[in-house]
Amino acid sequence: METKHEDTHINESILSEAILEDQKKNRIDHMTYLPGMEDIGSEILDQVVTAMKDYDYNTYTAEDVKRALSHTERTPEDFQALLSPAALPFLEEIAQAAQMETRKHFGNSVYMFTPIYIANYCENYCIYCGFNCHNKINRAQLNAEEIEKEMAAIAKTGLQEILILTGESRNKSTVEYIGEACKIARKYFKVIGLEIYPVNSDEYAYLHECGADYVTVFQETYNSDKYETLHLAGHKRIYPYRVNAQERALRGGMRGVGFGALLGLDDFRKDAFATGYHAYLLQRKYPHAEIAFSCPRLRPIINNDRINPMDVHEPQLLQVVCAYRLFMPFASITVSTRECERVRDNLVSIAATKISAGVSTGIGSHVEDIEDKGDDQFEISDGRSVDEVYQALLKHNLQPVMSDYIYV
């Protein structure tokens, strides 16, 4: 298999208003499954959507926040209070409580990993994403030899956990192709995560057999009406199929699943609540599952002038991260390189437990002899190497951990 590179001249980076209007008329129903998509029912989806719609964060008071902080085990209503505007004046107390929970369950440990982007072909039209199919960027896909070179280079840094990412193209990045990448990764790493397009339970089972341990799926926004306006075409347009991806992954034998909304696409408080409540419901249904959260904020991407993000400032980001910790004390929380090193270092000293290092969002960026790399998905704000992040953690009296899994 040869490396494939393509300069996508299919369309201008942003379609004309006339074409957009035409697409609006011809959009498929975002709530109806496409042929081949596994339908596992809507039990959890219905609960999440109902609770999110009923969540009026402006009704919560300082007394509600104090009550939530006083509890040792927190209910969904406590979680709602901690995410409300009324909680902001208590941010210092919330951060202290979150830090205590983090130290109680994780000690000073902070887990390190890095992502590897093996392809950036995409068949979706998500208007906020740098990889979307209409964006005029360089496309690339690594072959097996190049994947192995990249992973060998990453392993030399001392990292033992890898996150494999592709663009959302079943045609270019087939399940079999991703499976081969997992098999290669198993030679070098103890923990393998996937951030790929959602697949069916049997396909997750196959990827698990190939070596994958956990799956992260970003719902982007849980507001189905907003979701419909942001995802104009492609398989990602189907809202319920994406919401149920984590449960299908668990049915397929994955050890853990990750959740995340792209904060800033819609009302961040409602999206943060829906994300946490979704994870909470799955944890209750699958008690063995390892739960993880990511908390990305919308970042600038190539050729994007259509999104006007609802501002999520640093205090609000801290509020979300701490609320996750207090509501789901055993969950892993990752801080994205979308954030600058100051913010990331502060968050891991309080509530986050996982941090990426040596990050590139381009294709084939770890080995110099892989030419014509594909474009990055988004801009990163923390470009520190593995050693630099490692040393920064030590300076904060934290213990960098490469892996705590042993295979026997």
Residue ranges of predicted features:
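Conserved, mostly hydrophobic/aromatic
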Residues: 98, 126, 164, 217, ...
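Canonical Radical SAM [4Fe-4S] cluster-binding loop centered on the CxxxCxxC motif
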Residues: 106-146
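Generic structural signal for well-ordered alpha-helices
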Residues: 114, 151, 178-182, 204, ...
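Alpha-helix N-cap and loop-to-helix initiation/capping positions
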Residues: 142, 173, 177, 233-241, ...
